Structures are given as structure tokens and as C-alpha cells.
């Protein structure tokens, strides 16, 4: 058994998996934590830094164009490698261009480039996930996933901790971004050497097959809206704690960028890897629900470490302990959360549904930034991190509400169709669609504003209305799900 498990590690495509995983993880920090550190050092105000987290909306909305990348094939290197190559070349150019800018004087251009990087990175993730699924046989997907996750974490480590250290000690911020762009060259070579899948699912022939059928299947379940809320809320406390961690450690506590890079980025990512692996081991002994509950409690409680940092004297070991424990528990929660997403996918529509669910899981990480910046300025760091502990509670309560259907799906490997409240669900769906449309318009206008093509003063209000309308639709659907579940008796 062990030799069969290790066989994939001896094959040439394991190196390609590792390098492409690295390419997938590299851009994320360059538009989030590392960029946040650069703006902090350049004395950009806290609200602007928090607002910059919105550039990651591509990770939230990637499900909108994921069917198109499945439907259409580029004229070079095939359906999977063609899209991989295109996104990687665009990433290289955009990241290199970021190195020519200064946050203090060219903030709008920097925002526009960050949006482009996030869009190309999210698109690369879509295709890489599909390529892995197509290339790896079923018995090798576990080991293949481990290799790609290792590459992903290494990419985050390089663009996070190592990048901060290089920027602080050797290259400066602009030179560091040029180096990060150059690191994509081996990834492009790996894409050229990668095999194009030969035994793939047939390409969708119609828009209905590519887009509508997977969504109809998911929203036809009796717990679909509660699941949407659970996915958004389960890691909300973790998202709050992590949204301004770099700024907190540099500006709030007083550590320099090099110390934060070594401890928060490097030690933190290593702790996340250990937590994910240990969580996977524990999940062999626990049911999915129990793992989600225990790990969710731990990841919420671990945010108290940052609260202690905010009320005690500055000490490097205290920062190390808080960062390690929070990321360890966060990694355990992530392992259970990924298992939840896999359980929720119908195998007939796994690509589009996984893109939808994983995109929703990024909602907290993207949208808490502006709220977090406002909260800290209004109430201070200590109150903010206490609030991040409390923010984990709604997700745990919702998990308890969903327990019955989660256990049913895990045991029976199928889903229960919805039969009650059809008119109410239709209204909830239209409300959600209206909110998402408003957010899409807001993102388009924000990009035009960043390029100095237009200037709209109503953009903050449009964002608030879009979020409020979308959340209203999800909350209404969740309430209808709760009422329907009370009528359902599962065996």
C-alpha cells in the first residue's frame, strides 16, 4: 500500500504539480499581506489599506467565468495548458509592472494592477484545479493534492515572509516585485512541459450545460442557502483576525517589517501546513461534523492571542506564540473546511460547483478589510481582536443547525431535493442575483475610476447597497431553509 501511495512522488509530473502549485500560491500575498506591508511602511492611512483588500474580489467571483474556461479552448497548447500559459504570462507582466509604481503617488494605478493580478491568479487557480482533476487518476489524487498544496504554501511563503525580508534588507519593495515576477518563468516552463489531459469530460456544448445545470442542481437542495451562509461565516472570525495582522504587528505593536516577515509570514505558514496535516490525521477518527465543530472552536479561540499582544508589552516570543497558535488552529479548520466543500459537490458538476463554493469561502477574507479598518480606528486593536473571537460564533451556531443534513449527505452520498416554499426561494434567488449584479457594476466602475477614466462619488454607497441586497437574499433563503428543515425527518 505504501509503495502504491509513493508511486506518484517518483513520476516526472510530481515536479510539475509542485511548480504549478507554487505558481498558484505566489500571487496571493503580492496583492494582500505583502502589498499591505508596503503601504504601511509608506504611511498610507489605515482605511485605505483595509479598502485595498477588496482587490481580491476576483477570488469571490471566479465562479462566474469558470464555466467559460471550461467551454472555450485557446488556439494554442490545448484547453488546460493554453489557459494556464495565458494567465501566467499576464501575471508575470502585471507583477513586474507593479514594481514600477510607488504607493504614495500612484495608488490608483497600483489598485488597478492589483485587480488584474488577482483576476489572473483566480483564473489560474480555476484551470490548475481542473488540470489536476483531469490528469491524476483517482488513486493518485490524494498524493497529488498534497504535492500541489505543498507548492502552493511554498509560493505563499516566498511571496510573503521571504519577500518582506528581501524588501526590508536587500532589494527594496520595487526590486522585490521584479524578482517575484521572474520566479514565474520556471512556472511557465513547467506549463509547457506539462501533459495536456487526454481523457477529459466532454466540453459543454451549450450555455445551459456549462452554467445553468450546476447551479440548478445546487440551489435545488433543501439546505443550499444555509450552506451558503455556513461557508461565508465558518471562517469569518479567522478572516477578521488575519485581515490587518501585518499592519497590527508593524504599526500597532511596533515590530519592523523584517521581524514580521520571519515570524508572521514564515512561521505562520509553517504552522498552517502543520495544522492542515494534523487536522487531516484527526479527521480519520472524527466525523465531518465533529471535526468542523472542534476545529471551528479552536480557530475562533486562537484569535485571543492577538488580543493578548495588543494589551501586553512588545516581545518577539509572544508574537511567535500568538502567530503559531492562530495559524495552527486555522490550518486545522481549513482541512475540515476543504473536506466540507468536497462533500457538498455533486460529482457530475464538481468543477463549477467547487469554484462556486471556494469563491464564496473568500467572501470573508475580501470584504472584512474595509470594516476591519473602520473598526480599529473607532475602537482600537484590543476590542477588534476580542470582536474577532465573537465573530466565529455565528458560524458555529449555523453548523449546529446544518448538522442533520450534513450527516445525511456524508452517510448517503446524495442530497435532498427542495419541495417547500418555491415562491419564497425564487424571490431569494432574484434578490441575490440583483446584489451580485450591483457588486459587479461597482467593481467595473471602481476599475474605471482607478484608471482615471471616470470619477464616481457614489461608489462607496453602491458597494454598501450591493452587499446589503446580496446578503438579504442569502439570509431570506437561509430562513426558508431553516423552516423547511424543521418539517424534514431524515433517517
From Swiss-Prot:
Record topology, Periplasmic segments: 33-47, 106, 241-264, 304-327, 454-457
Membrane topology: Multi-pass membrane protein
Cellular component aspect of the GO annotation: plasma membrane
Annotated family: Belongs to the major facilitator superfamily.
GO MF annotations in UniProt: peptidoglycan transmembrane transporter activity; symporter activity
Coiled coil (UniProt feature): none
InterPro entries: AmpG_permease/AT-1, MFS, MFS_dom, MFS_trans_sf
Protein's cellular compartments: Cell inner membrane
UniProt entry tagged with the keyword Cell membrane: yes
Cross-referenced Pfam families: MFS_1
Range of residues in the leader sequence: none
Keyword Iron applies: no
Protein name (record): Anhydromuropeptide permease
Transmembrane feature ranges: 12-32, 48-61, 82-105, 107-124, 222-240, 265-284, 288-303, 328-346, 422-453, 458-485
Keywords: Cell inner membrane, Cell membrane, Cell wall biogenesis/degradation, Membrane, Symport, Transmembrane, Transmembrane helix, Transport
Taxonomic superkingdom: Bacteria
Functional summary from the UniProt entry: Permease involved in cell wall peptidoglycan recycling. Transports, from the periplasm into the cytoplasm, the disaccharide N-acetylglucosaminyl-beta-1,4-anhydro-N-acetylmuramic acid (GlcNAc-anhMurNAc) and GlcNAc-anhMurNAc-peptides. Transport is dependent on the proton motive force. AmpG is also involved in beta-lactamase induction.
Comment on protein domains: Four hydrophobic segments are not embedded in the cytoplasmic membrane and form two large cytoplasmic loops.
An annotated GO BP: peptidoglycan turnover
Amino acid at each position: 500500500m505504501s509503495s502504491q501511495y509513493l508511486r506518484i512522488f517518483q513520476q516526472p509530473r510530481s515536479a510539475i504539480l509542485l511548480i504549478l502549485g507554487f505558481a498558484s500560491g505566489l500571487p496571493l500575498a503580492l496583492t494582500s499581506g505583502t502589498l499591505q506591508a508596503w503601504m504601511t511602511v509608506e504611511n498610507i492611512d489605515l482605511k485605505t489599506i483595509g479598502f485595498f483588500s477588496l482587490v481580491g474580489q476576483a477570488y469571490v467571483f471566479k465562479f462566474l467565468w469558470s464555466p467559460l474556461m471550461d467551454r472555450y479552448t485557446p488556439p494554442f497548447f490545448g484547453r488546460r495548458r493554453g489557459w494556464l500559459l495565458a494567465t501566467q504570462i499576464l501575471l508575470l507582466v502585471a507583477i513586474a509592472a507593479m514594481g514600477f509604481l510607488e504607493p504614495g503617488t500612484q495608488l490608483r494605478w497600483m489598485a488597478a494592477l492589483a485587480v488584474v493580478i488577482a483576476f489572473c491568479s483566480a483564473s489560474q487557480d480555476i484551470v490548475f484545479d481542473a488540470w489536476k482533476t483531469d490528469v491524476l487518476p483517482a488513486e493518485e489524487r490524494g498524493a497529488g493534492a498534497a504535492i500541489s498544496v505543498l507548492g502552493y504554501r511554498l509560493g505563499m511563503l516566498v511571496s510573503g515572509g521571504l519577500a518582506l525580508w528581501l524588501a526590508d534588507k536587500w532589494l527594496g519593495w520595487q526590486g522585490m516585485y521584479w524578482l517575484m515576477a521572474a520566479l514565474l518563468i520556471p512556472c511557465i516552463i513547467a506549463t509547457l512541459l506539462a501533459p495536456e489531459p487526454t481523457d477529459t469530460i466532454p466540453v459543454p456544448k451549450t450555455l445551459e450545460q456549462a452554467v445553468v445545470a450546476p447551479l440548478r442542481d445546487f440551489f435545488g437542495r433543501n439546505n443550499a442557502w444555509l450552506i451558503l451562509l455556513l461557508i461565508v461565516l465558518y471562517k469569518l472570525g479567522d478572516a477578521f483576525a488575519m485581515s490587518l495582522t501585518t499592519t497590527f504587528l508593524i504599526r500597532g505593536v511596533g515590530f519592523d517589517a523584517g521581524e514580521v516577515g520571519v515570524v508572521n509570514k514564515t512561521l505562520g505558514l509553517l504552522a498552517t501546513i502543520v495544522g492542515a496535516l494534523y487536522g487531516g490525521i484527526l479527521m480519520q477518527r472524527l466525523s465531518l461534523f465533529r471535526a468542523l465543530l472542534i476545529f471551528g472552536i479552536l480557530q475562533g479561540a486562537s484569535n485571543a492571542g492577538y488580543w493578548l499582544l495588543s494589551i501586553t508589552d512588545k516581545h518577539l516570543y509572544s508574537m511567535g506564540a500568538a502567530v503559531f497558535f492562530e495559524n495552527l488552529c486555522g490550518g486545522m479548520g481549513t482541512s475540515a473546511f476543504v473536506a466540507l466543500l468536497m462533500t457538498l459537490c455533486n460529482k457530475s458538476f464538481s468543477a463549477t460547483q467547487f469554484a462556486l463554493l471556494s469563491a464564496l469561502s473568500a467572501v470573508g477574507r475580501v470584504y472584512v478589510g474595509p470594516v476591519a479598518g473602520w473598526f480599529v480606528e473607532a475602537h482600537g486593536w484590543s476590542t477588534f481582536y476580542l470582536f474577532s473571537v465573537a465573530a466565529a460564533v455565528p458560524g458555529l451556531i449555523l453548523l449546529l443547525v446544518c448538522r442533520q443534513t450534513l450527516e445525511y449527505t456524508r452517510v448517503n452520498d446524495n442530497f435532498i431535493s427542495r419541495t417547500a416554499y418555491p415562491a419564497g426561494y425564487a424571490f431569494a434567488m432574484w434578490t441575490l442575483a440583483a446584489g451580485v449584479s450591483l457588486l459587479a457594476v461597482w467593481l467595473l466602475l471602481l476599475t474605471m475610476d482607478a484608471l482615471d477614466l471616470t470619477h464616481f462619488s457614489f461608489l462607496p454607497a453602491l458597494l454598501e447597497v450591493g452587499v446589503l441586497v446580496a446578503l438579504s437574499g442569502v439570509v431570506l433563503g437561509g430562513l426558508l431553509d431553516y423552516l423547511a428543515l424543521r418539517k424534514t425527518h431524515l433517517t
